[in-house]
From Swiss-Prot:
Belongs to the bacterial CoaD family. This is Phosphopantetheine adenylyltransferase. Its main location: cytoplasm. ATP binds at residues 8-9, 16, 89-91, 99, 123-129. It comes from Deinococcus geothermalis (strain DSM 11300 / CIP 105573 / AG-3a). Homohexamer. It holds the Pfam family CTP_transf_like. Its EC number is 2.7.7.3. Transmembrane segments: none annotated. Keywords: ATP-binding, Coenzyme A biosynthesis, Cytoplasm, Magnesium, Nucleotide-binding, Nucleotidyltransferase, Transferase.
């Protein structure tokens, strides 16, 4: 039996990897699907292509896992791929309440079943949002994300830091020039 593990994966975390690894032991094949929502364009740190590349690298050691993307309703993707099971990871009871509503809706409109896998307790606090916040301040995220995500975050924030530094340096030079001009 085959399953789909959907998400935005911006980026994939150790919690995602925990759920995915366990799902790969349960199902013959798992497709990790990056759901692309055009209305959320610009809200992600990583582009769709970057997220796909990070996922491919992070899942390379799992022979029965593939990576894909889709724009639209998940149930439409499931129909197209002829897959009937969605895997969702849960961190806390609050996740369950939301995911249960979505699971019922998916079953009603798409005849798709949802299998919930609880994330290991050590990952219950980890989210992509939290990881990005910590990484943006140079914090250690090595335990919270696979190596591919950590490297991508480091590169992304180094670029942003360099751009910020250049902007501040340019602003400082303009300020010094204006100060010198005002003295004359």
């Amino acid at each position: 039996m085959n399953a789909v593990f959907p998400g935005s994966f911006d980026p994939i975390t150790s919690g995602h990897m925990d759920v995915l690894t366990r799902a790969s032991r349960i199902f013959e094949h798992v497709t990790v699907t990056v759901m692309h929502n055009a209305r959320k364009q610009g809200r992600h740190l990583f582009s769709l292509e970057e997220r796909l590349e990070i996922l491919r690298e992070a899942t390379a050691h799992l022979p029965n896992v593939s990576v894909d993307s889709f724009s639209g309703l998940l149930v439409d993707y499931m129909r197209q791929q002829q897959k009937g099971i969605i895997v969702r990871g849960l961190r806390a009871v609050s996740d369950y309440e939301y995911e249960l509503q979505i699971a019922h809706l998916n079953r009603q409109i798409g005849e798709v079943e949802t299998v919930f896998i609880m994330a290991a307790t050590r990952w219950s606090f980890v989210s992509s949002t939290m990881v990005k916040e910590i990484a943006s301040y140079g914090g250690d995220i090595s335990e919270m994300v696979p190596r591919a995500s950590a490297a991508a975050l480091k590169r992304k924030f180094a670029q942003q830091y360099a751009a910020r530094e250049a902007e501040l340096s340019s602003a400082g030079e303009r300020g010094a020039q204006q100060a010198a001009e005002s003295k004359t």
